[in-house]
């Protein structure tokens, strides 16, 4: 009888672990995080609250200046399809350069050139990506930007299985 009870508990524990492991999904998407998403995430992470009106206004002024300075120095961006995403949406997309990403999102939480680590982060998408990816930048909460020698070639995001879809 005691063995049967132990087997039942072991089966339940394994089932719970299997369910918990499958709650997150890595999805490959063409658009990365917006600058405002990172700002809000960092505010919650550091202050455990939403940014105040003054903090938002100050951040928007700083971001306007950074984007304006970058666009003055890189006028060729205006003729690309990424221009609207960069200037108005302030969002990184496939094709964005490292400098554009740093302008919008600041420095990454982690950078790697290790193929094994990148394969772990990309999961099921790695076989398609591995030929062109040279480096990965990680941004919270679950964004990974994959670069070739020049720009972003792929973007993945780890989301909960039950997160809302936008």
Model-predicted segments: where are they?
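Residues within mature, well-folded domains
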Residues: 20-166
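Bacterial N-terminal signal peptides
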Residues: 7-16
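Positively charged n-region of N-terminal signal peptides that target proteins for export
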Residues: 1-6
